[in-house]
Regions:
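Alpha-helical transmembrane segments and their immediate juxtamembrane cytosolic regions
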Residues: 1-229
């Protein structure tokens, strides 16, 4: 959500060039680094830019979203349409991880929501950055409840392969869910993710600190942390 809130609805030549310089080129560079890493560590290398390595899927997803954003902006209800696309994509077995397409379509509502909130200036209009004690308390309770549910119902989550649901990398049938209601599970998980995202942002301190400016370098952390792991 946050990574797409700064996207413009009608990118021109400058914005399109930034897609290449800020996303595509780093993706290709780090794919090359991953190829070398695999060769040194595992003794083999299978370079394939259509299959992003580990965390690099996000760069491809972000690039694709910025390319299709002008068309999404033309729709009357972009959030509704992307939600239908996300749910519907899970029923199609031919949509896989090639060019990170399965995750791009699956997470498309979150990308669109980030742009939509920024485009309609909802943060400023509703003073969403203002700290409210009841919202802070409710957010803390939400995380406590989520943590308790994650631990107490662990056997259930493992049985339903919740981990695979959260990856958005496989269609419903590949996870073992062939029922018509599988799309409802994805919808429910997205709603839970949205609520926890709101809770998280409500707990983030509003005032600046000496380390606040480090936030602008999170892309470097994102790209490099996977090598450490």
């Amino acid at each position: 959500v946050r990574s797409t809130s700064i996207c413009a609805s009608s990118p021109g030549r400058r914005q399109m060039v930034r897609v290449i310089t800020d996303i595509v080129l780093p993706y290709l560079a780090f794919e090359g680094l991953w190829t070398v890493t695999k060769l040194l560590v595992e003794g083999r290398a299978d370079p394939n830019i259509t299959k992003p390595s580990w965390t690099l899927w996000f760069l491809l997803a972000l690039a694709i979203f910025r390319l299709v954003l002008p068309y999404l902006a033309l729709l009357r209800w972009p959030l509704l349409w992307t939600l239908l696309i996300s749910i519907g994509a899970g029923y199609l077995p031919n949509i896989d991880s090639t060019f990170s397409l399965s995750r791009t379509l699956g997470l498309l509502p979150f990308f669109t929501l980030g742009w939509w909130v920024h485009e309609h200036r909802l943060v400023e209009r509703f003073a969403l950055l203002r700290t409210r004690w009841w919202l802070t308390a409710a957010s803390a309770v939400a995380f406590v409840v989520a943590g308790w549910a994650a631990w107490y119902f662990l056997d259930i989550w493992q049985a339903m392969e919740l981990r695979q649901w959260l990856f958005y990398d496989d269609d419903y049938a590949s996870i073992g869910q062939t029922g018509w209601w599988a799309g409802g599970v994805r919808l429910l998980l997205m709603l839970v993710a949205l609520l926890l995202s709101i809770a998280f942002f409500s707990l983030v301190p509003r005032e600046g600190h000496r380390w606040t400016h480090f936030g602008q370098y999170t892309m470097y952390v994102y790209l490099l942390h996977s090598f450490v792991l």
